[in-house]
Amino acid sequence: MEEILKTPMRTQDVFLELPARLFYLPAIGHFAKAIFSKHPYLSRCRDHWLYSLELLLYEACSNVIKHAYKDQEVGKLRIRLWFEPTSVVIEVIDFGRGFDPSSIPEPDLKDPPEGGMGLYLIKKLSDRFSYFYSHEEEGNVLHAEVVIPDRECMGG
């Protein structure tokens, strides 16, 4: 059983809610690039490491858009971000049907599929990952925490 991570006690630094539609996915990508590259805690980080945060958020939102509301009206998704001096916490919340992440097999990396790599990437890019139903949110929460590495962020 996966550890359920706790949302930080303080209010999120960023809260964004939007319709879960493919139309918004490029905007989410641009938003991620802008917020991660400009945040004071991350301003000294290398581009390839910042890209991993962007990819994590993008893939989490993409999965919600493509899978959470299948056979339903378009739903919504929420993005919450917390910036700490030593980590970034990303939460993507949806109100569609949930799933069991352990039921999704890891892809064959020797013969990678064209699609279906999202959850694998999210887990690999996270230092701590969980997915759970939140009664408080009344929705599904993908929670990922990424430690800010000194080696990629030149000491801070």
What do the PLM-derived regions correspond to, one by one?
Residues M1-F15, A20, I65-G156:
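Conserved beta-strand-loop-beta-strand hairpin that lines the nucleotide-binding pocket
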Residues R10-R46:
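Helix-loop-beta hinge of the Bergerat
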Residues F23, H48-Y51, G75:
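Conserved catalytic/ATP-binding subdomain
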Residues P26-G29, L57-Y58, G115:
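Hydrophobic alpha-helical segments
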Residues F36-Y58, D111-P112:
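Conserved short strand/loop->alpha-helix "switch" segment adjacent to the catalytic nucleotide/phosphoryl-transfer site
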Residues Y58, S62, K66:
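Short alpha-helix lining the ATP-binding pocket of the histidine-kinase-like ATPase
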